[in-house]
Amino acid sequence: MKLKVLNAFGVGILVSAACNFTNGQSIEDVVLNVYKEPTCGCCNGWIEHMNDNGYSTAFHHPTNIQKLKDEFGLKNEWRSCHTAVHKDGYYFEGHIPEKFIAQFLSAPPKGAMGLSVPGMPIGGPGMEMGNRFTPYDILLINKDGSHSIFASIKKASEQH
């Protein structure tokens, strides 16, 4: 009897864990785990941008997102509103256009930790506001704590 109860309890935990993933995905299907505040609409816009470009995503609402970013090793100067963690362990911080994530993933630079768009530039994926656009840089962040410019986005059309 105890074994049946324990098995039922274990199955319940697995079913509950599976329900945390969006669109009925299994754990193996998730390519990006996105950590964000529950009320952030621009993060949802970025997730939609990634899904529209063929990525599978799951989102999570940690109790303390800043502490989580500290644990990931993301410096304050690199931060934005959400952090995506790729299944291969790379970090994508903020409103990075999908085409630059694909470029990065096709040949990750040695020692790279990921990419970042610090802040929340107007006109980036998820931050659309009509025809308004603020130029921004995409940073290559490295495991040694350094960073460099991966790409400079001067106009909205360069994001696609």
Where are these regions (language model features)?
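Thiol/selenol-based redox catalytic cores and closely related redox-interacting motifs
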Residues: E71, E77-H160
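N-terminal, post-signal-peptide region of Sec/Tat-exported proteins
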Residues: N44-G89, G94
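Active-site-proximal beta-strand/loop segments in catalytic clefts of secreted hydrolases
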Residues: Y35-E37, H60-P62, H95, P118-M120
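Secretory pathway export signals and precursors
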Residues: V15, K36-T39, E77
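Bacterial Sec-dependent signal peptides at the C-terminal "C-region" and cleavage site
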Residues: A17-S26
